[in-house]
Amino acid sequence: MAYERKEISIEAIRRQEDICREIYDSFVSQKNRPLAMVDTYGCQQNEADSEKLRGYLAEMGYGFTHDEFEADVIVVNTCAVREHAEMRVLGNVGQLNHSKKQRPGQIIAVCGCMVQQEHMVEKIKKSYPVVDLVFGPHELWRFPELLLKTMTSHKRVFAAEKSDGYVAEGMPLKRDSSVKAWLSIMYGCNNFCTYCVVPYVRGRERSRRPEDIVA
């Protein structure tokens, strides 16, 4: 069956930006700027995704830190290509209970390929109560909405639905370097090679339009 390319509308992205402003406004009365930490595992695509996560967080008014004991929000962007990477992530996520004990209001989010797998979501639900928010790569574009829901509901939020994937343009970016950037031209894969998890967690192959790549 042929895959139908699906694109997130620019209006939907704008709604996420409105939520960013809503979160930003909620921090105005605070004396100190809130801080976020984005911890990235895996491939260059994850690096590119983390630039989008940081872009959204910057729009919300967050500064950035590499110290989990300073962070108000921690986002762990995970990899699923090798079992060792998954075990490393889970070990490090488990250690975050120390920072959360020191900062009870700290929000810990786990996203990326690892949590696109149903068994990993169930494992986090049962064994990692320190985690407040879980979302797969197909839900990255609505990170502000999911974070706000976590903040306001005071309940754990899980959003890792099965999907062939989307193309979402127009998300804000915050890059670590002023001289280089991760530039995605396509997402997913159609090959379904033996032992490869990529099509199952990243979805079907879909390309960005040339005009969006060079914009």
Segment roles from a protein language model:
Residues 1-215:
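Proteins enriched for Cys/Gly/acidic motifs involved in redox and nucleic-acid/cofactor modification
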